[in-house]
Amino acid sequence: MIDRKTFMKSCAAFCAAGISCSAKADQPGATSQNACSLEQNQLHAVQGKLDNGQLRFAGFVESIEKRFSESERRKLFNGFGRQCAQTYRASLLDRYKGNIRGFLDEGLRNWMAEASYDEAAGTIRIVDKSPTCTCPLVKEGSTPPSFCDCTLGWQEEAYSTILGKPVHAELEESLLRGGKRCVFLIRVIA
């Protein structure tokens, strides 16, 4: 699972490769076509692998939908999301244990368009700022909307870790389910 920080580093590396291509193209005897063919081929190969992996994963999700009841599928995807959240434990979640406001501030700086916390009501509402699904396994238009149950597991694991209390996550809106954005409502379980 790639995190946002690694993704941004990868983007920076590809930009640096583009700048390197420009510099190579300025050298005597070089053409822009031969100066960057390797970098462009590598980028194309990586993108092809990503696309193929996402399509295969979408097929895997479809197989799960056919073979498991809705209840079993939800548990499976929820557990998958919880496991994914664990990969962020050391780098993100543990830093904000007991500091939900600090976590929400970091989220607003990086991946949340909106975040509200009503401590008295025990609710947190998050609006993701990304115009596309942030899961690197998802290919919009191919991955079934049922896979959004995975992100509910991620949200529950992340917020229960930070708050030190069990929570329940609901999806108010989802890109995969036809929405314009992803919106989560997190409720602390009393």
What are these regions (language model features)?
Residues 170-175:
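Short, solvent-exposed loop/turn elements at beta->coil junctions and helix N-caps
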Residues 65-147:
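Amphipathic interaction/junction segments at domain boundaries or subunit interfaces
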Residues 159-167:
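Short secondary-structure junctions
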Residues 21-62:
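C-terminal segment of N-terminal export signals and the immediately downstream linker at the start
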Residues 181-188:
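C-terminal edge-of-domain segments
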Residues 148-152:
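Active-site nucleophilic cysteine motif
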Residues 1-15:
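N-terminal secretory signal peptides and thylakoid transit peptides that target proteins
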